[in-house]
Amino acid sequence: MSDTICISICYCDGGIRLFKSTVRGLNTPPYVKIYVHKTKALLAITPDEERTFTTHKTPRNIYDENGRMVIHSKKLCVALYREMNWDKDKLYRVPGRIMKEGNVAYFDLNKAEALN
């Protein structure tokens, strides 16, 4: 079984925003880790229990009215925009799926939708 979820990627602020449904689909882990498969244009997000050099903390207020989760990584955003030939002046929303069996969120970067 899988559920549809989204992330958005912004070149200008170097941020990857995880929608609340994405964090909820991963069972609100304390930390998440991002993986990119360059040749298949896939981005994966996995839950993690421990803080490491490669994990990102889930905010405690994620489900508050003003709560949000943004992973700031200008280098990753620049690399994604370059690889996907995206317009740097646009924000991209990428639909994905939660694979419950492996508790992994997968995002097909080829299905990104340009906004603004």
What is each PLM-predicted segment?
Residues 1-3, 28, 90-92:
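Residues that act as N-cap/strand-start positions at coil-to-secondary-structure junctions
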Residues 6-8, 31-35, 95-97:
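Short, surface-exposed charged micro-motifs
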Residues 15-27, 72-73, 77-78:
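Short beta-strand-centered segments at strand-helix junctions
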Residues 17, 35, 44:
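Short, conserved beta-strand segments within well-ordered enzyme catalytic domains
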Residues 23-41:
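Acidic (E/D-rich), amphipathic helical modules within compact regulatory domains
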Residues 38-39, 44-116:
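Mature exported/compartmentalized surface modules and terminal targeting/interaction regions
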